[in-house]
């Protein structure tokens, strides 16, 4: 049994006061329409048609690479008119119709609507809400059958009291759409062609109307302005947080936790406030993430501690390692078991060996550091000569004294020691002491200048 999908995405979204279409506003780091497309793609439809209008090129660019047919609605004359533009591109099968600005609709709810709607039925997704203001109302007869959908601007006082609303999501066979869409008239306050009129046509043709409901009310919430967008962001994030907590993770405050990608978690983790997850992140068991941390496209193994105000991007933090506070681990780092990237340490494309420590105020770039090394405060690997990047290699058990500069390319041998304040531009053999700084002198005849006093 095949399925076509129509996503309506032609609206301007004037209340967003933006230079991009409403459906390209972002929620959890994805555009609204990407959320919708991701949900319908899981239904494995034969084709997806997106009806565009305002700034159509931007919408097409955002969905580039997906198996989507774009149809341009030159004049925004209503939802019925929009679906009519898509009609020639649909196959002779059931059609699922939904909106590009309703981002939280789940695949499960859509699948239920499609599966329970026969080819000769009209499927309608409705919901009961406490505040139906601004939404189309579902009107039923005395037997409970749906008779029509009335938009709020066209509703009378009695109809405005109805709390069952139209979500705008339908499932109907193309054959019925071919019959009904040309019959829609713009005889309403807005002078638009409402898709909701197909309810009236279905009743007239004695077509059975199949009504289903969403699992959660938030799934059918649309976005018209930035206030609604922010509210929906919190709904999304709270829902994600609850799913994560159900897997055995403690979150200090679910209202101050953001996932902008995918998070795979182990058990007994602790996540403090204002943590942001970007891209694909995996946490092992017993991981502790301090406040104000950002984790992006990284793997954090068991028993790791990421202390507050730290960032880990595109790297692996091995079991029992410690990062932070105020540390930045940039892409392509591998922090081995029990190693320490301490406060105000930045690492980029660096391997920090098992048990090694860089505890304070250090830059490690393009480096390979062995096991059980000590990198003192203020150490800098000088990896860039103005044109190319070069590598620093430090052997196991090496000791790099504070405030030293290692001019790459350079090798520090196993067990070697670099004296504090040294600038090392040549390789240091194993177990040697390297020191390069001016000899200390004491000048016993020196006198401190006397401050001039005001006259």
UniProtKB/Swiss-Prot annotation:
Gene from which this protein is expressed: glmU
EC number, UniProt record: 2.7.7.23, 2.3.1.157
Region annotation (N-acetyltransferase) ranges: 248-455
Family: In the N-terminal section; belongs to the N-acetylglucosamine-1-phosphate uridyltransferase family. In the C-terminal section; belongs to the transferase hexapeptide repeat family.
Cofactor: Mg(2+)
Subunit (UniProt): Homotrimer.
Region (Linker): 227-247
Ligand binding (UDP-N-acetyl-alpha-D-glucosamine): 8-11, 22, 73, 78-79, 99-101, 136, 151, 166, 224, 330, 348, 363, 374
Protein name: Bifunctional protein GlmU
Pathway: Nucleotide-sugar biosynthesis; UDP-N-acetyl-alpha-D-glucosamine biosynthesis; N-acetyl-alpha-D-glucosamine 1-phosphate from alpha-D-glucosamine 6-phosphate (route II): step 2/2; Nucleotide-sugar biosynthesis; UDP-N-acetyl-alpha-D-glucosamine biosynthesis; UDP-N-acetyl-alpha-D-glucosamine from N-acetyl-alpha-D-glucosamine 1-phosphate: step 1/1; Bacterial outer membrane biogenesis; LPS lipid A biosynthesis
GO biological process: cell morphogenesis; cell wall organization; lipid A biosynthetic process; peptidoglycan biosynthetic process; regulation of cell shape; UDP-N-acetylglucosamine biosynthetic process
Organism: Francisella tularensis subsp. novicida (strain U112)
